[in-house]
C-alpha cells in the first residue's frame, strides 16, 4: 500500500491523542449478519490494497491452511480446507457464501478482515503498530472481535503485528471449529423453516437478534419460553446486550423459533397506526431476525469449547504482553491486570460462554473518539451506546461518508480535527449566569430564545384565553401563550392581542397558541397575526397544537414575521414531522413542546418518557430546536430532573436535558386566573396520582381525574365531576356508535333518560321546555317559549348577556319570528327583559303559535352559525347531538354562576392527574408558583457545584477596537475619517452585516450599535422593525463606500453609505446617520432625483433611551408625517399649485398636457423592452396605449395624497388597483391631443390594517371626458379617525318594469322617488334609475349618514330614456341602502355580464416574461419617481425587502401581453383595463401571465388576466380587460333557407329564444289564427283557419284588412290580398303540397322570426356588438332591421312580414293546384368553366334564354362575383338554363365558343322545354341548384308592379319618429346598393340613381 500513498498524512486526531487533547479507542466487530459477506469484503480489500496486505495475507494463509489440514473429529475441513490465498486469487474456487458464513470459516475470516482494515489504516498513516498503539487509550472487541483487539494490544511493530495476528487467527480458528462442533443439533422441520422465512425472521440458526424490547422485556420473554420447554438442553439464554433495545438470544434453532412465535403475538403489524391506543396497551414494535451464525455463542451450550481450544492451541498470551488496556466484554475489566497470567481462556470464554454487556463496556472506554474497524457496522452499535456522551465514532471499514452522527474513515486522515460529538449534558444542560442586576439566573436554549426563565405557561383553554391573565404572567417575567383556540371571531382575537400588547413591557413578545385541527380558524387567526405584526404589535411566535403542518405551510407562517414557531406533537411520528420542519428551516427557531399523555386538558396516548428516549438524539441534531417538557409538572423537585437531564439516567440513558418546562393546568388555581372560586377549591381538593398510575384515568376516575373524548376527537383530562362522568358515560354508550343511523336510533330510544340526565348533571341542560315546565322538542315550543328559554339560559337578566354574540343570536331569532308574521320588532332593545317585552308587544297573539317547521330548521341553523359562541344548552337529539353536548365545553369552569344552580359539579374542569397533586393552595399568585420552581432549580444547580458565570462588561464601541481587515474590502483611514470600499473582484462581496459588525465593533450600548444592530425601534409606543438596520443590511456592491466620521476622541459621529447612481461616476450619499452626543440621532435619506437636478432629501430623528432593562431607539415623531408628505409633494405635485388648503372633498387639477410623440414613444419603448421577444416584435399603431393615461393623470391622482387633511404615512403607501375606462363613444387618444385631468377622492375607508383611499379622475379632451381613471391607494397603519370616512360611487344602471298594480303602488309609496308629475301613471312602463350613493361615518366607524341621489327615466320603445323625475334619499345612521335594496328586489341591471359556458383562449393563453432589472427608465418615462422603486436603501427603510417594480409598469407589461393575444393592432379595441396588484414584483422576477376569455358584456369580450411569480407561484396581478371584438357584421339570410324544425334546438335550450318564439307565436295565433311554431315543427300541407265566435271574427277582420289596390289610380278599390276570402267566409284553408313552411306567406315570417331569435340569443349571451354592421339578404333585410334596430315594434314587424308574404304569394295567378309557372335557381359560373365563362358570359347566357324562349329569365341576386348568382324566371326557362350549363361544363373548348354557338345550344333545348308542365321538380345540375319551394320570381321585373302598392302599405306601418338614424348610419348595408347607410347627399344620389326612386328625387330637389 505504500506505493499508493506517497504523501504524508498529518492526522490531527492522532496528534491530539498524543498531546492529550483527545482520547482514542479502537473497537473490532464480531459475528453477525456480515458473516455472509465476510469473504467478499476481504476480497475487495485485497484487490485494492493487495501489496500492503501481502505479508498479513500470506501469514494467514499459511496458518489457516496448516490448521485445516490437521485431523479433527468433526472432519469439517476435509473437503474444502482453508486455502485463503488461492480463493483470493481465484474467487471461483472459493466455497459458497453460506459455507463461508459457518463458524469454522467466518471466525478466522472475520479476524483476518479486522486486522487487514487495521493494517491498511496504519500503512496509510505511515505509522507502525507501536506508534499507532501509543496514541490509543484502550481497545475492545465485540464478541469474537476481542481476538483482533488482543492482537493489536500486543503488537508494537510490524513483525510483532504478524506474530500477534497469527495468535489471533489460531484462536479464531479453533474457537470457530470447536463451537460449531459443540453446537446442539437442529430439530426444526422444513415447514417450520419456511414459516420463519415467511414471517421475515430469516433462516433459523443458533442465534436470534431481537430489536425493540428493553432488557427486562427480553429476560421475561426468555423466561416465558424456557418455561414452555421441557428440557434444560433446549433452553435459550440472553447472550448479548448490544444496546438498550438490541439483544441477541442463543440456543437451539427450534427453541429460538419458539421465541419468534412468542414475539409474533406481541409484535405490532407493519404499518399499523397505534397512536390512538394507550401506550401500555399497544403491541410492541419489535423485530426478530436469525443471524447467520452456526453456534450458540455466549451460552452454556459451549462451556466445553474453551478447554478444547486450549488443548488445541500451541500459543499463549499473558496480560503483561498487552501494551494498552484490553477490556473484557462482560465485566469491562482491563485484561492488562492479569499481568503474568494467561488471558487466552478469558478471551475464549468471553466469546463462548460469557454474556456480552456491550453498552456497559462502551461507557467504560472513556474516550472521546472510537475507531471501529469492523467487520460489519460495529460503529453503529458503539454509537447507540455512547450517543449523547460526547463520543465520536468513526467507522474505519466503510469508505462511504458518515451518517447519523458517525464519522467516515476520512476523518482520521484529515489535517483538521473531526467534529466533536455532542455531550448532551454539557451542551444542553442548564447554566447559571449573572444578569445585568447581578442576580443569578438559569440559562438554556429556551431562555436565550425567549429572554425569560426556563419555565413557561402553555396555551390552554380557558385559562390563557383571557389576555389579562397572560399579561400577569408576562409581567411576572415568564413566557406564556395566549390560547387562540378560545376565540371564535377575528374582532375579539384582535382586541385581545391589542390589549395584551398594550399591557406588557415593550421588550416582551407575544406568543399565540393556535389549533391546526381547525383550518378555517387558524387561517383567519394567522391573517390577523400577519396584519398586526406588520403594524408593529409585538407578536413574536406561535405554538401550533392539534396537528403539525407541512414545511411549506410553515414557510408561509415564517414569512409573516415571526421569530419562533413551536409545536406540540403527540407521537413519535409527529416529532419526526417537527424535526423535518426544523431541517427545512435550519436558521429559524423551532420549539418542540412534549407533554405526553399525562398532560392536563388535551393529551396524547403516549408515555412521557419513551418517545423522547427514542427521538432525543434526532431532536438534538437540529441546532434550531428548543425542547420543552410538560405534563404533570407543578413544582421544583419534580421538574428539576428534566432541566438537568437526570431523568433519563434512571432509564440507563445519558442525561437528556430539556431546555425548559411548561405548566398548564397547574396555574388554574393561581390568584390571577379566571377560574371560578368553586372550581379552584375543587382542584385543590383533588388528590391526583403519580406517574405510574395516570394511564388508568382512561377507564376510571384516577386521583379524581378522568379521561374523556373531546369535541375534537382527542382524549382530554378533566376532574371527575358529575357532568364529566355523564360525558364519559355518553362516550361509552352513545358516541362510540360510529354508524350514524344506529346512533340516532339509540338516542331516540333513550330520549327521556338522556334529557333527564342532562338536566340533572350536565352543564348544558335540555333546551326544550314548555310553559308548563315539561320537557319538549323544539318543534313543540311556541315563539314566546323559545325566546324565553334563550333569554333564561343565555343572559343574566338585567345584567346583560353571558356572551355578546348570544344577543345577536337572540335578535336573529326575533327577526325570524318577525318575518314569519310580517312585522318588525324594535331592534334597540338589548337587555333580556326588554327584548322579551318588545317581542311580545309586537307579535301579539302570534307569540303563542307553535314554531313553523321552517323556523325550527332556521333556529337550529343559527345556533350552529360560525363566528358565534355555541349555545349553552342541547337543543335537539339529532345527528349533531355530540356537537351540541361537547362544543365549547370549558368556559364554565370560569363562570360557575352561569351553571344551573351554580353547581360546580356540572362543570368541565381540565386538570392533569399528575399535576393536580401540586395544586394545594387556593389563589396562589402566579409569580409565586413560577418563582418557586425557578428558585428551586437555581438552588439545586448551586448545590450541584455549578458556578454562575460573570457577565462581561462591554466598553463603548469605537472603530479602532475591531479587526484590522475585512476580506474584499479596502479600509483607508484619514485623520477622522475611515472609508470602507468594496473591491471589484470575481468573489462575492461581503454581506453588509459582516461589514457592520466590523464597523460597530463589540460595543453593545453605543448609538451606532443600536442603529445598526437592534432589531426593533419604538415609535409612539409601537414596536417596529429597525428601518435603519434594514436600510443598511444587504449585500454591498462593488464600488460602494461606507464612510465613518470620528470625533477627536475617536467616537463615531456619523456613518454614510455612498453609491454611484445610474452611470454617474461621482458618489452620492444615499443614507447618513449621525449623532454628536450619542443620544440624539439624525437619519438622512437622499434618494436619486430623475426629473430635477436638485436632490430631494428626507430626514428622521431618533433618541437613544436608556432604561434599567437596557437601551432602546425611540423615533421622534413630531412633524414626521408632514416631512414625508412634503417630500412626496416635491416628487409628484406641480410646484405652481398649493394643496395645503385643499380638503377631502376638493377637486385637483393637473396641467394641460399635449401628447407628444417622443414622450409616448419613450414610454412604449420602456414597456416593450420589459416584455418577452415575441411581444417586443409586436408593434401596434394608431392610438395611444391606455396605460399611458396614468402618466397624463399622475399629478392629479397623487395630489390628494399630499393634503394635510389626509392623515397618513406615505412611506407605507401601496398602490392597490387602477381602472381605466374609455367613455362611451369617445375617440381613443391620439398624438397631438391636449388633455387635462381633474380628480377627487371618492372613497376613504379605514380597514383593520390601514386606510384605503380611492381617487377618481376624468381625463378630458376639449372639456369632454375621454377616459375615467379610478385608482386605490392603501396606506398601511392603524387609524382611528373614523369620522373622516366616506364613500361615493355610481350605482349600476337599474331598470324596473312596472308590470302590476302592486309594483306601481310600491314605487309610488317610496318617499325617495320624486316624480316631475306626481299624478303620472306608471303602469306598463319600464323605468331606468341612474343613482349615486354617498355614505359618511361617525367617530365609531358606523354609518353616519346615507345619501342616494339620481334621476329616474322612462325607457321608450325607441330605446331612448326620457327623464320623468329624480331620486333623493338621506338618512342618518342607516343600516343598508333602502333604495338599492328595493331596486335589487324589484329590478335588474341594464347591462349584465354573460359568463361563457366554456371560458378559455386558444393561443397565447400563457405568456412568460421577466420583470425589468431596474426601474429607473420607467420612472423617468412615467414621471413616477417614487424612490421605493429605484433606491434600495429607501425601499428597505420604508419596510420593503428591496426595490419593487412599479405596479403600473407591471400592469403595462401584462396589458401588452393581452393586447398581443387579442390582436389589437391599432389599440382601438381596449375599452377598459382594471388591474389589482396582489403581490410585489421584484426586479428580474419571472412572471407567468395567464389570460382567459370568461364572459361577454354588451358585445365586448371580458378577459380575465392573472400574473404569477413563476418561481413561487404567488399571484401578483389580477386584472380584467374589456375588449371590443374585431369589427363584426351580422348577416341575415333570405327565403329558401327554411327547413322543418328550424330553430327548435335553440328554443328548447335557451330561455330567451323560447320567450321570443312564444311571443311571436302568441301574436300570430291571436291576430291570424295560426301557430307558427306548429308550422315549423310539423310543416303541414294544409291549414284551415276557422272564423267562428268573437275571436274568429276578429281574426277574419285582420285578414280582410290586409288589402291591395286594384290599380294605382286614385279611385282604385281595395281588395283583400287573400284570394277567395270574403266578409262572410266561415273559414279559410291554406295548402301547399311541399308543406306550408315552403309557402311564401308562412316561410317569410318563420324565417324572419327564427333569425331574430338567433340574434336575441346572441344578444342575451352578450356577444352582439352595438356598433356592428348588419345586412339582410332579400327577406333577411326585414329580420336584420327588426333585430338590430327599434324602427318598428316586434309585433308590427311580424304583421308586415306576414303581409309581404301573403302579397307575394298572391302576386301571380295560380292554377287549380295552387301552382305558378315561376321559380328561382342559384348558379355558379365557375363550375361551368374555369376559363372564359365569367359573370359577363353568364349574363349573356341568361339574356339568350330570355330572348329565345320569350319567357322570364333574369339574374336577380348578385351574391358572390363569378361564383354565385340567383336567377328568377319561368320554370321552362330555368330548366333550359340548367341544361345549357351542363352542356357547357362538358365542352372541351368553351373559350372558343361564339355567341351563335351559345345561341344554338339554347335553342336545342327549347322544344323539350315546351313539353314540360309546372309540376316538374327541377333537379340540380353541374352549376345550378333549383330553389324548390319558391314559386315566386322575387326581385324580378315581373313584381315591379307591386312596388308602389307595397310602398304605400309600408308607409302606413312605419312611424317616422321611431326611426333613429344612429341605429342605421354606418351600420346598415341595404341590399339595393351594398354600401353602409348614410344621410349624406352623395349617398342619396347614388341610391336614387340605382333605384330611380321618385321620392328620393324629390328629396334631392328639396335639399338643393
UniProtKB/Swiss-Prot annotation:
It catalyses: acetyl-CoA + n malonyl-CoA + 2n NADPH + 4n H(+) = a long-chain-acyl-CoA + n CoA + n CO2 + 2n NADP(+); holo-[ACP] + acetyl-CoA = acetyl-[ACP] + CoA; holo-[ACP] + malonyl-CoA = malonyl-[ACP] + CoA; a (3R)-hydroxyacyl-[ACP] = a (2E)-enoyl-[ACP] + H2O. It holds the Pfam family FAS_meander. Keywords: Hydrolase, Lyase, Multifunctional enzyme, NAD, NADP, Oxidoreductase, Transferase. The keyword Hydrolase applies. It comes from the Eukaryota. Induction: Expression is positively regulated by the dothistromin-specific transcription factors aflR and aflJ. Residues 1001-1491 are annotated as: Dehydratase (DH) domain. Residues 1530-1893 are annotated as: Malonyl/palmitoyl transferase (MT/PT) domain. GO terms for cellular component: fatty acid synthase complex. Its EC number is 2.3.1.86, 3.1.2.14, 4.2.1.59, 1.3.1.9. CDD domains: FAS_MaoC. GO terms for biological process: fatty acid biosynthetic process. Belongs to the fungal fatty acid synthetase subunit beta family. Fatty acid synthase beta subunit; part of the fragmented gene cluster that mediates the biosynthesis of dothistromin (DOTH), a polyketide toxin very similar in structure to the aflatoxin precursor, versicolorin B. The first step of the pathway is the conversion of acetate to norsolorinic acid (NOR) and requires the fatty acid synthase subunits hexA and hexB, as well as the polyketide synthase pksA. PksA combines a hexanoyl starter unit and 7 malonyl-CoA extender units to synthesize the precursor NOR. This is Fatty acid synthase beta subunit hexB. It comes from Dothistroma septosporum (strain NZE10 / CBS 128990) (Red band needle blight fungus). The lineage of its organism: Eukaryota, Fungi, Dikarya, Ascomycota, Pezizomycotina. The gene is hexB.
